[in-house]
Amino acid sequence: MVSAIAGLTQAIEAVGRSENSQTLDQIRGYEGSGAARYFAAFSQLIVHPDFTFSLRVFHPPTDPVNSLLSFGYTLLLNNVFSFLLAEGLNPYLGNLHGAERQKAYLAFDLMEEFRSPIVDTLVMKLINQKILQPTDFSWATEEGGIYLVEPARRVFLKHFEERISSATSHPDVQGQISYRRVIQLQVKRYVKAVLGNVGYQGFRRTI
């Protein structure tokens, strides 16, 4: 755990030192390196003996933990996507992410800062508190992945809604607001950054 956190810290410091001197490919390289170290630390926080996690696998998810992460990230992406549309932004015009294939790259960019406080925290809770069990998953033979079955899927949706509606703080407003409201405020910050030529400040959860 200590070595994984140390490696993640080094990756973050490297990005901070780069400022504007790095290309997008180099920055994406830091992102990939940081993600690998992050999930190495994440795996060591799983204490449920029947769940294991060694590597982030995207499509299709090959184990229950990856399945939960992918499901949660999809729900989070949809929330960010909706707020982008509400502000009149094109969700497909990203800054960090982008490729020839048409995907909602701006939504992917802006959801990054919410993966850990919303989805990863939720997945850890559902596993470690034994709210979900390995028997809540099944193989989807056509897709070749592992997915939640009913009613476990509804359980996840219920807890996701509770998590994204839970209270936190944001420097742009006084008092406690929901994470969903924070997403909206961050999208508004992005609009100001684009229109006003000011730096974008990402959301950092206060613990």
For each of these PLM feature ranges, what is it?
Residues 1-207:
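Active-site helix-to-loop segments that bind/position phosphate- or nucleotide-bearing substrates
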